[in-house]
From Swiss-Prot:
Gamma-carboxyglutamate residues are formed by vitamin K dependent carboxylation by GGCX. These residues are essential for the binding of calcium. Disulfide bonds join C22-C28. It comes from Dromaius novaehollandiae (Emu). Ca(2+) 3 binds at E23, D29. Keywords: Biomineralization, Calcium, Disulfide bond, Gamma-carboxyglutamic acid, Hormone, Metal-binding, Secreted. Its main location: secreted. The carboxylated form is one of the main organic components of the bone matrix, which constitutes 1-2% of the total bone protein. The carboxylated form binds strongly to apatite and calcium. GO terms for cellular component: extracellular region. Ca(2+) 2 binds at E20, E23. This is Osteocalcin. It is found in: Secreted. InterPro entries: GLA-like_dom_SF, GLA_domain, Osteocalcin, Osteocalcin/MGP. Ca(2+) 1 binds at E16. GO terms for biological process: biomineral tissue development; bone development; cellular response to insulin stimulus; glucose homeostasis; negative regulation of bone development; osteoblast differentiation; regulation of bone mineralization; regulation of cellular response to insulin stimulus.
Length: 48
């Protein structure tokens, strides 16, 4: 059987969409370099 999120194949990163949004915002991207993506995203867009 196949389980979603199993070790077979590359499981999609649930935060990938938010990471892309932050990377497209120069201010969020810069802040992420200093405090990490999740915290930078939270400051700009609210809870991840």
């Amino acid at each position: 059987s196949f389980a979603v999120g199993s070790s077979y194949g590359a499981a999609p990163d649930p935060l990938e969409a938010q990471r892309e949004v932050c990377e497209l915002n120069p201010d969020c991207d810069e802040l992420a370099d200093h405090i990490g993506f999740q915290e930078a995203y939270r400051r700009f867009y609210g809870p991840v």
